């Protein structure tokens, strides 16, 4: 990864990089990874909180930047989100036959946050800073499209896009050993993964992403990586034969995740 980063940045003549950091593991690992190939002054780390972001993750973002000794700015975006919502929600679109009114759902409003961060803040900052901005996505989320088009899926390079979530954690610990220092604070490894886009993703209440990475990493891997890709029907058969953990290689018990057969099947049908 370090070699690839060096070669890519050299090929596109990009010596400066802007990284949006949330206080979560994906952006922290990306920040540390880029720091391993670039001087600290060539990085700009940016935290863009809304009212849904906890003090925990905001503080972790600051600590990460301090540890990496990289320039850091915090740019709250609530007022801009509210302005976008006020412009679009209930907007009337005239047509020859009638008047159509647009409505923004809660899900749409969540995506506005991700798009504001990337297309307004990070893109503009990278231009002013004289560099590129990163996509911090991982393979688990990309496999099922858990991301926002024109939002957190944007960026010049997605360096960790071929790493499953458990590999992101492993890379984070490897980078800490590389630096011989906990550049990535220990708490980032333990805080619940969450996009923090709504009250339903409030980590202070134990809420977060809908993905159970200890299981879904291995489920999704079986769908896309083997030459003889596994089907949902085979997954269901293995589950009924009580050999799913062995077949997938999950580090956790399936029964500890899904209390009933219905829960398991509902989750399988979701993806």
Q: Where are the language model's segments positioned?
A:
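ATP/NTP-dependent adenylation/nucleotidyl-transfer catalytic domains that generate, transfer
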Residues: 1-22, 27-271
